[in-house]
Amino acid sequence: QPRSRGLGDVYKRQAVYGNPQRSATGFDLRRMNMLLAVLEKRVGFKLAQKDVFLNIAGGLKVNDPAIDLAVISAILSSNMDASIEPEVCMAGEIGLSGEIRPVNRIEQRIGEAEKLGFKRILLPKHNLQGIDTKKIKIELVPVRKVEEAFRTLFG
């Protein structure tokens, strides 16, 4: 059962044969493998023996590292069979040590999230510096590490 809310699909299966399959359509496979390694090391999810298929909907190819946080959240959601609240969105680049790095054009991203009706946005804590929060209606949820984002999304 995919967990995507129409934004793409992530499927996970237990591999009962040889090496697990990894597939990414519209997203860099090497980057996905790096994100899977970070999930194993920092959050403790054992994904080494599971198949992971990632598909970005609509035939889009996404190279923006700001999608990293959304990708790992979708993978975790599928692995745990737990939904992410539909009014939550996120932006953040993930580093090798699990840190959530700042992204470009954060105010523009926040504005677009508001226009699309999102109520909360997870974003890198470092991106809060210099943002005029008085005009922002969406709840800003700053996170520093992957583990923190995981706790925020899944309790």
Q: PLM features: what roles do these ranges have?
A:
Residues Q1-V10:
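Short, small-residue-biased leader/transition segments that mark boundaries at the very start
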Residues D9-G155:
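Peripheral, non-AAA+ core regions of ATP-driven protein-machinery
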